Amino acid sequence: TPTKGWNEAEFSKSFKYYINIVSNADMPHVYTLYAANGKAVRTLEDNAALKAKLEDYAVAKKEFIQIPAADGTTLLNAWLMKPVNFDASKSYPLLIVQYSGPNSQQVSNSWGMDWTQYLAQEGYIVACIDPRGTAARGEEFRKCTYMQLGKIESDDMIAAAKWLAGQSYIDAKKVGIWGWSFGGFMSSLCLMKGNDVFST
């Protein structure tokens, strides 16, 4: 597809047609009907009204980066969301949001707007990190947590938090971590093991 971002396809029963769904961090979902030969038949939904509405607001953008893992060699995929009025000469509180569960993926160039946007509007920097054990990085990366679930992921999250806390625009005394389900377990583990970096 010509658009960079997250793509998925839903095929008709006969496989003569498919709907391509594409989005990226700056573009809401676009649904396009294609023939099996790859020729676009028509756009079903382009979310033009939503795009136009968003232009009325100052929306914080996701910045995709890589952060060193605890092993010192692996780079972890991450995104940062800074306040719209970000000033590099200031230091901001940081909240890391993560799930970190086996074969999951939270860092992707796909559309989504949730409460993290509100935090950025309120002067927080938000980071999302996929540690080792998560998906879309190959078999070795995904399976390295086998029989030691929670160890490598928490080590990576603590290392990433320390790296971020070392950036001049982060207030190293105000670094928090949050997650749900497996991410809640990870948050608790990181607070216990990494209490020298996490304050909440």
Give names to the regions the model predicted:
Residues 7-200:
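Serine-hydrolase catalytic core recognition
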Residues 2-3:
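Surface loop/turn motifs at the tips and blade-to-blade linkers of beta-strand repeat domains
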